[in-house]
Swiss-Prot record:
GO terms for molecular function: diaminopimelate epimerase activity. SUPFAM superfamilies: Diaminopimelate epimerase-like. This is Diaminopimelate epimerase. PROSITE patterns: DAP_EPIMERASE. Homodimer. The record marks H138, E182 as: Could be important to modulate the pK values of the two catalytic cysteine residues. Disulfide bonds: none annotated. Pfam families: DAP_epimerase. Keywords: Amino-acid biosynthesis, Cytoplasm, Isomerase, Lysine biosynthesis.
Length: 249
């Protein structure tokens, strides 16, 4: 199987064009294993589609399916344009719905569309939370310091609510910093596009930031987010790393 390794703002992915009906869940676990495989946060399978430019299947590195991955969608768009020669403005289908993307060399902008749902704030484990669905569910806690991030606490919240967990610090009305514990990876990751999107949207909804901001994840790679016409957009660099063939068991 030919595969391509991509990185996007701290998240890394293995991407391939579907050419057989293998057990993709088991394959995802094998490929994404950082000790015995290629190593990645997620596995993306690109499939043809009659109506859209393509369809994808996204797998977390534990083999579970995910409806959406923000940085994964940007990596998939970069791959579709530069490898599969699809037009730079594209529309593709995910488990969370239709995604629009624009590729400009190594920068990719993606629209996550309309926010799926937002719940009221609540108290749990000594902190205030809000749940926001940007294609996948995210718990968000606004904090005074990102040193408050606690992996054990995140594990408890993730298990109870079956959601990703984000801590966000507002630096000013145009800049946020975010740390994310990702469901499916079951650990803190260097970045999470849908998580940063949830943090931005809730901050904007609560009138704490403007409708266009910069967000810095743990990777340190700044990304741009904007909310316009009731859609959430974000943009950042995508890096093609390498391509190779893999003989899976």
């Amino acid at each position: 199987m030919k595969f391509y390794k991509y990185c996007a703002s701290g998240n890394d992915f293995v991407i391939t064009n579907a050419d057989r009906k293998e057990d993709r869940s088991s394959l995802a676990k094998e490929l994404c294993n950082r000790y015995e495989g290629i190593g990645a946060d997620g596995f993306i399978v690109i499939l043809p589609h009659e109506k859209y430019d393509f369809e994808w299947e996204f797998y977390n590195n534990d083999g579970s399916r995910a409806a959406m991955c923000g940085n994964g969608s940007r990596a998939a768009a970069h791959f579709a344009h530069h490898i599969n020669k699809i037009n730079p403005s594209m529309i593709f289908l995910t488990g969370a719905g239709v995604i629009k993307a624009k590729v400009n060399q190594d920068k990719v902008e993606v629209s996550l569309g309309k926010i799926k749902s937002v719940q009221n704030t609540f108290e749990k484990l000594g902190k205030t939370w809000q749940l926001c669905d940007t294609g996948v569910p995210h718990l968000v806690h606004f904090c005074q310091s990102l040193d408050e991030f606690d992996t054990m606490l995140c594990q408890k919240m993730r298990q109870k609510y079956n959601a990703n967990v984000n801590f966000v610090k507002i630096l000013d009305e145009n800049h946020l910093k975010v740390r994310t514990y990702e469901r499916g990876v079951e650990d803190e990751t260097l970045a999470c596009g849908t998580g940063m999107g949830a943090c931005f949207y809730l901050a904007f909804l609560n009138k704490k930031v403007q409708n266009k901001v910069k967000i810095t994840p743990k990777s340190g790679e700044e990304m741009g987010f904007a909310y316009k016409n009731e859609e959430l957009f974000f943009e950042g660099k995508v890096k093609y790393c390498f391509e190779a063939n893999y003989n899976f068991s």
